Amino acid sequence: MAAAASYFSGTALMPSQRSGAPAPEYSAAGTGAAAAPSPSKPRDPRFSGCVPATVLHISRSFAAALAADGGGDPVFSIDGVETTNVRVLGRVVSVVSRDTDVCFTLDDSTGKIPLVRWITDQSDTRDTSYIQEGVYVKVQVNLMGFQAKKQGLARSIRPINNFNEVVLHFIECMHVHLESVQSKMQRQLPPSVQTNEYTHVPSSGGVRDYQVHFTPQVNQGLPPAVQTNTSTYVPLLGGVRDHQAHFAQVNQGQFSPAVQANTSTHLPFSGGVGEHQIHFTPKVNQGQFPPSVQTNTSAHVPYSGGFREHQVHFTPPVNQGQFPPAVQTNLYNHAASSGGVREQVHLTQANQFSAYSSTGGLQHDPQRMVLEALQQPDILALEHGAHVDELVRRTGMPKANIMGVVKHLAAAGFVYWTIDDNHVKSMCNG
C-alpha cells in the first residue's frame, strides 16, 4: 500500500492496488503489460502526491524532458522537481469509447491533453461514465511508461459540481509554481534591486554606527540632483554616534533655495548623546509668501551639556492670524537651555469647538446656525423636535436654504427627522 500512496493524495485507488498487487504500467499500444518498477529517488515532500498543473505547463515540461533524454521514457519534472503524477482540471472536448478503454481529450483553456482510462472492473466503468463531452472533470494523471507518446493515464476521474473548484485549481497551480521558482528568481535579480543590506562601521568607542537603507539604491550614477538620498554618518570621539535621517534630497541645486527640499545637518561633538533631528516637511517656498503662510522651520541651538534639545514639529503654522484663535494652528517656540533635556511638543489646536467640529468654524455658517438653534433648551424640550418654520424664524434664512442645510446634516448624522419631513431634532441632546 505504500507504493499506492505515492500515486494519490486522496482515497481514489485502483482495484489492483486495493488488492495489494503492484500498480500496472501500460505501453503506448495498450497491451497492459506491467513494466519493471524504477528505483525510488528522493523527492520534494510537496510533490509526494498529485501536483496541480495546467496543460500548458505539462506540455512545456514534457518537451524539455524529451529534448534532454533524446529517446526512451522521459524524466518528467515540474519546475525542476521530478514527479510522475499531476492533477489537471478541464472540459472534455472529445471521447472515443472502446471495450477495453476510453480515450478522451481534456481542455483547460491553456491547452489540450489526450488521456486514456483503462477498463478492468466496475469501478473503472463508473469513472468512465463521467467522461462526456462538455463536462468539467478533475483527473489524476500518471505520465510514466508512455515512451515518446504524449498521452497520460487517467487514474481517477471526478466530475466538477461546484465551479469554485475550477478557480481553486488554478490558484493551487500558481501557488506550487511560485513556491518552486521563488528562490531561483531571487538569485537572478540584479544587485540594484535585491533586498536591502546593512552597513556597520566601527567607531573609536561606545555603540557602533547602525545604518539602515529602507529603499534600494536604484539608478545610482544619475546626476546628483536626481539621485536618491544617502545617509551620512560622522564619527565622534566617544559615546553614541550621530543618527541622521534624510527623507529625499531630490533636485537639490536645481531650484532656488526657497523651493529646495530640507537638509538635516548634524555636527560632531565631544561626548554625550548626539542631536536627533527629524524634519517631516520640506522647506518649500520659504520666503515667497508672507510669514503667516510659510512652512515650519526647525531650529536647534547648541548648549553646554546634557542631552540636546529634541524638537518635533507636526504641522506648519499656516495662515496664522487670518482666522479666529479657535482655528489657528499652533506656534512653536524653542529656547536654548543650559543643561538637561528640553523637549517641547505642540499639538494642533485647529477647530477647537465643543461639538460638530466638521461643520466648519465660520461665525455665520448656515449649518452651525441651524445646529445652535436645535441646541436651545426650549427646542430640546420638544418631543417631536423643531419645525422647519421655527428654524427659519430663529436663523433668518430662507426656508429653501434651511431645508437644504437640514437634509445635509441629516445625511451626515447630526440631525434626524421625527414625525414628518418638517420636524427635525438634533442627535446631541445637550
From Swiss-Prot:
Post-translational events: Phosphorylated in a cell-cycle-dependent manner (from the S phase until mitosis). In response to DNA damage, recruited to DNA-repair nuclear foci, as a hypophosphorylated form.
Gene Ontology CC, one term: chromosome, telomeric region
GO biological process, one term: nucleotide-excision repair
Region (Disordered), start-end ranges: 14-46
Alphabetic keyword roster: DNA damage, DNA recombination, DNA repair, DNA replication, DNA-binding, Nucleus
Top-rank lineage group of the source organism: Eukaryota
Ranges annotated as DNA-binding: 86-160
Family annotation (SUPFAM superfamilies): Nucleic acid-binding proteins, Winged helix' DNA-binding domain
A Pfam family this chain is assigned to: RPA_C
Family according to the record: Belongs to the replication factor A protein 2 family.
Assembly information from the UniProt record: Heterotrimer of RPA1, RPA2 and RPA3 (canonical replication protein A complex). Interacts with RPA1C and RPA3.
Name this protein carries in UniProt: Replication protein A 32 kDa subunit C
Gene: RPA2C
